[in-house]
């Protein structure tokens, strides 16, 4: 049996599926509409507030929790993630299932989205059986990457130290925090490149599979660096 097996932590949006193909636009519009209705703001003012909280706190809901405690969290998450419409715009990443099958160790989804959204998207992509666990923000304390406690809570749920984890994410900020906690880091996406806290930069799932084969060599790997 392998000693200290690796645990792979995967972001969801723009890592396991292409959220920029329309899903983020849909979610942002739904969030803006909800904020406008509940706080009695114009659409423009609600959009500005949504973006301000996202930039300031890492998630719109985090800002709402701080400044508008009267907001019903479950209602906000439900209204801002219209699942039926989201699934009509879902575009998975090529070679995902094949790559997941080649990764040694446990695998989990670690997303800032709500758990019902994580499960619905994973099911629709046919990926649920490839993972040992699926985590949305309400599973680890309504926290959000890059809050360090979010990572530690997920590690606790998996009963694994951060040092045994590999974080795969399209966000450099999220990976910077993962590295600070001792995780290996894989920056996923066409815009990824070499940075001091990045162990590997990959543009697609095929390159991730290649990196996984070199994991024991403890070296930086950047497939898409100019």
Question: Where would I find each of the regions flagged by the language model?
Answer:
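Asp-based, Mg2+/Mn2+-dependent phosphohydrolase catalytic module
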Residues: 1-6, 101, 114-226
């Amino acid at each position: 049996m392998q000693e200290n097996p690796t645990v792979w932590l995967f972001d969801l949006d723009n890592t396991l599926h292409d959220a920029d193909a329309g899903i983020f636009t849909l979610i942002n519009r739904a969030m803006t509409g909800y904020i406008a209705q509940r706080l009695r703001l114009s659409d423009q003012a609600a959009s500005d507030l949504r973006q301000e909280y996202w930039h300031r706190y890492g998630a719109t809901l985090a800002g709402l929790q701080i400044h508008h405690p009267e907001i019903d969290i479950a209602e906000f998450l439900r209204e801002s993630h219209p699942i039926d419409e989201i699934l009509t715009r879902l575009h998975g990443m090529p070679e995902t299932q094949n790559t997941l099958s080649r990764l040694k160790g446990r695998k989990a989804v670690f997303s800032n989205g709500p758990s019902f959204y994580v499960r619905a998207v994973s099911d629709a992509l046919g990926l649920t059986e490839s993972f040992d666990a699926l985590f949305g923000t309400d599973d680890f304390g309504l926290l959000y990457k890059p809050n360090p406690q979010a990572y530690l809570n997920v590690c606790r749920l998996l009963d694994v130290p951060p040092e045994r984890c590999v974080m795969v994410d399209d966000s450099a900020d999220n990976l910077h925090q993962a590295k600070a906690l001792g995780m290996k880091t894989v920056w996923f996406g066409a815009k990824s490149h070499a940075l001091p806290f990045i162990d590997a930069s990959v543009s697609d799932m095929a390159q991730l599979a290649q990196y996984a084969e070199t994991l024991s060599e403890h070296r930086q790997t950047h497939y898409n660096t100019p």
